[in-house]
Amino acid sequence: MLNTFSLIGICLNSTLFSSSFFFGKLPEAYAFLNPIVDIMPVIPLFFFLLAFVWQAAVSFR
């Protein structure tokens, strides 16, 4: 049980300190990719929603 809480604490701690990483800027040569990079974190959610749509299409067998 303690190991689980330790792991959760480590994960939360690392996300708090790496939050500045998420707000970093791309190098100037890749500035045209900014709109794509902004959308990229949402892409896994589309797959998650697709699973529900697929199950609804096959009537949740």
UniProtKB/Swiss-Prot annotation:
Transmembrane residue ranges: 36-56
One of the protein's GO biological processes: photosynthesis
InterPro entries per the UniProt record, alphabetical: PSII_PsbK (IPR003687), PSII_PsbK_sf (IPR037270)
Source taxon at top rank: Eukaryota
Keywords: Chloroplast, Membrane, Photosynthesis, Photosystem II, Plastid, Reaction center, Thylakoid, Transmembrane, Transmembrane helix
Propeptide regions on this chain: 1-24
Pfam families: PsbK
Membrane topology: Single-pass membrane protein
A single GO cellular-component term on record: chloroplast thylakoid membrane
Main subcellular location of this protein, as a coarse class: plastid
Subcellular location: Plastid, Chloroplast thylakoid membrane
Family: Belongs to the PsbK family.
Subunit and partners: PSII is composed of 1 copy each of membrane proteins PsbA, PsbB, PsbC, PsbD, PsbE, PsbF, PsbH, PsbI, PsbJ, PsbK, PsbL, PsbM, PsbT, PsbX, PsbY, PsbZ, Psb30/Ycf12, at least 3 peripheral proteins of the oxygen-evolving complex and a large number of cofactors. It forms dimeric complexes.
Described function: One of the components of the core complex of photosystem II (PSII). PSII is a light-driven water:plastoquinone oxidoreductase that uses light energy to abstract electrons from H(2)O, generating O(2) and a proton gradient subsequently used for ATP formation. It consists of a core antenna complex that captures photons, and an electron transfer chain that converts photonic excitation into a charge separation.
Name this protein carries in UniProt: Photosystem II reaction center protein K
Provenance organism: Nicotiana tabacum
Taxonomic placement: Eukaryota, Viridiplantae, Streptophyta, Embryophyta, Tracheophyta
